[in-house]
Amino acid sequence: MPSFDIVSEIDNQEVRNAVENAQRELETRFDFRGVEASFEWTSKETTLSAEADFQLQQMLDILRNKLIKRNVDPDTMEVGDPEHSGKTFSQKITFLEGIDAPTAKKLVKLIKDSKLKVQASIQGDQVRVTGKKRDDLQAVMALVREGKLGQPFQFNNFRD
């Protein structure tokens, strides 16, 4: 019986490269000359720090562009609120990985409401879809790509 898994993963190395490229661009941009602004990367989150709130927005746009160039979907970013401390503003960005329980339930409901002859089951941070026909599974893939559930999904472990 054919099956596949729906997962939500990001390549941490590509995200790190995008953050480093954004930092390099920040150092060469004219509007950031003489300004203390930086990107700080940790394993699951990035911290943006700058002297003004509008500079954080510019930095966020730079980071989005760099992520797109590195083939990382910017929808994986969860942007926190800007925090002001002293003379600097900082903003934390976390990268979503894995499918949380409410999103998995929405995904299963979306698949069941489509009336396709497939079964969807939640297995930890992924959703397994099984069906008798390969065409049904491909229809589910198209349905999930079209559905706007707030995060990007990948399909792996396709078995016949």
Curated annotation (Swiss-Prot):
**Mind telling me which Gene3D superfamilies this protein's record contains?**
3.30.70.860, YajQ-like, domain 2
Quote a single Gene Ontology cellular component term. Answer: cytosol
The UniProt record lists the keyword Nucleotide-binding:
yes
Task: State a single Pfam family of this protein.
Answer: DUF520
Question: SUPFAM superfamilies this protein is in?
Answer: YajQ-like
InterPro entries found in the cross-reference section: DUF520, UPF0234-like_C, UPF0234_N, YajQ-like_sf
Source organism superkingdom: Bacteria
Q: Which GO terms describe its molecular function?
A: nucleotide binding
Which keywords appear in this protein's UniProt record, sorted alphabetically?
Nucleotide-binding
Please state which protein family the record places this protein in: Belongs to the YajQ family.
Which PANTHER family does the protein's record reference?
UPF0234 PROTEIN YAJQ
What this protein is reported to do is described as: Nucleotide-binding protein.
Q: Protein name, please?
A: Nucleotide-binding protein TERTU_3542
Q: Which organism is it from?
A: Teredinibacter turnerae (strain ATCC 39867 / T7901)
